[in-house]
Amino acid sequence: MPQAHADKPLPMQKGEFVAGTWSADSGVTLDLLDPQGRHVRRLSDREKPAGVLMLVGPADGVYTVRAQGQGTYEWSVTERLPLAEQHAPAPTLDSPRLAALAQTLSQGGTTATFWEEMKRQGTPLIEPANATHDRVTFLWQGAERNVRLFGGPSTDHAQLSRLGDSDVWYVSFLVPKTARLSYRLAPDVPELPGTGMARRRAILATAQADPNNPKVYPERGIDAFQTYSVMELADAPPQPWVAPRAGVPAGSVEALELRSDILGNTRTIHLYRPAGWKPDGPDNHVLVLFDAGAYLGRVPTPTILDNMIAAGVIPPTAALLIDNPTADSRGRELPPNPDFADFLARELMPWARKQGIAVPAARTVIGGSSYGGLASSYAALRHPEVFGNVLSQSGSYWWSPPGEEDQWLTRQFVAVRTLPVRFFLGAGLFESGRGGQPGILETNRHLRDVLRAKGYLVTHREVAGGHDYLSWRGTLSDGLLELIGKNGLARQ
C-alpha cells in the first residue's frame, strides 16, 4: 500500500467558487489548509470512496490540499467562478405582459405606458393561463429596497422581484378562476435584527392597500393602512347576501353586558333580532358567533341574516355575537377551554333565554373563524345538548395543548361516541401548512374524514381563498344554508 503524503497548492480569491472531484482509499484523508498552514476543512469522507469538492475562498491566497495516510487518491478542480461573475438568475417572467415590457426596456423604452395601462385597468394584472386558472401578477411602483405581499395566494409574505433596474416590482401566481382574496402590499419593509417573528411582523409597518386597485375591503376603510385590496376573479362564487337590499326590513342589534362567574370576567354580547322576531316562534333558530367586532364589521352578519330571512331561504334566526373582553383573552378562551365552553352552555344560553332567545340544540348554530371555528367544535363536543350545529370557517384544528401532538380536538372526536351534531367545515385552498407541517386546509380535511367515519353529517366546503374575512363573509351564508336552510342538513 503506497504512502500518501503530499501537498498541492490551490490558489483561491476571496468569494471565488471552486468545484471539483476527489477519490481516495479509506486510509487517506484530504484536508484544506490556509496560506499559513492551518486546517480549514476536511475534503474527503472515510465513509465514501469519492465525492465532490465545493469551496468558497475565505480570502485571497494560496491554499494547500494535503493528502495523508495509506493508499491512493486523486483530486481535481473542474470549475472556478470569481465573485464578480456570480449573479442570481433573473426571475422567470411568467406574465406575457411583463415579458413584453422587459423587451421594451431592453430596447431603451420606459415603463410610463405600462403604468398608465395598469392605472387605467386596475391591478393586479390578470392574464388567462388555461381553462381553470388565471395568472395573477401583483405590482408595485417605485420601491427602493424590497416589496412584500401581505395576504393574497401566499401564506409566507411573498417577496416581489424588481424588473431589471426599473420601477416595476412584481410577483406572479397561478390561481383558480374562482379565487377571491384580500391583500396588501408592503414597500421597503424594515430589515430588523432579532427573532424571525419580529422580522416577519415588520411587514405591518408599511403594509397598505394597492394604490392601483379600486376594489377595497372594507369598502370604507379609515386609511390605506387599515384597508385591504380585493382580488376577485371572474368565476368567484357570488356573495349575494352581504349588501343591504332595498325593501328588506332591518333587524335590531342590542349590546348588553354579561358577567361570568365561571370565567370571572365581563363581556359585551350583541343580540341581533330579525324584524318581526317572536320569542315563541315555532321555527325560530339561533346563531352564536365569536369575535363580535369582526362579525359586525368585516362580516356584516345582521345584513346577511336580514337578507336571507327576507328571502325565505332560512327561518327566523336571532344571533348572539360574543365580544372578547380583553386583548389577550381570545387566545386563552377560544382554543379548547372547558371553562369557556361551560360559560357558553351554562351562563350565556340561559341568559339569552331571559332575553327571549331560546331554542333547542337542533336549532342552535355555533360558529366562528380560525380559533372561533375550533371553539365551536369543542363547545359542541362538550355540550351537544345545547349546540347541535357547528359552522366552522377555517377552524384551527392544528391546535394542541402544550406538550401534546397536534390536532388534539380531532382525537377527542375519535374517542367519544357519535353525538347529535351536524357540521359545516369550510377552508381556503391557500391555507396550506408551511415547512411540511399540516395547515388549516389539511387539518380540516382530516377532521372531515374522522367525523364522516364516525357517522356525522358533514358538509365540507373549500374555496379559492385564504385566512380572510372576505371569504368568511361568503361562507357564513353557505354554512347557514347547509345547516338550517330549507334544503340543508337539517332537512335530511
What function would you assign to each model-found segment?
Residues 2-50, 58-60, 67-70:
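Acidic, Ser/Thr/Pro-rich low-complexity intrinsically disordered segments
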Residues 11, 54-58, 172-177:
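Short, flexible loop/turn segments at beta-strand junctions in immunoglobulin-like
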Residues 17, 27-30, 72-74, 135, ...:
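Exposed beta-strand and adjacent loop surfaces of beta-rich binding modules
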Residues 32-34, 77, 149-151:
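Conserved aromatic beta-strand anchor motif in extracellular beta-sandwich/beta-rich domains
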Residues 47-52, 165-169:
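Aromatic sugar-binding surface patches on proteins
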Residues 59-63, 179-181:
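Exposed beta-strand face motif in extracellular beta-rich ectodomains
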Residues 69-80:
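Edge beta-strands of jelly-roll/beta-sandwich modules across compartments, strongly enriched
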Residues 90-156, 163-492:
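Non-catalytic cap/lid and distal C-terminal segments of serine-dependent acyl enzymes
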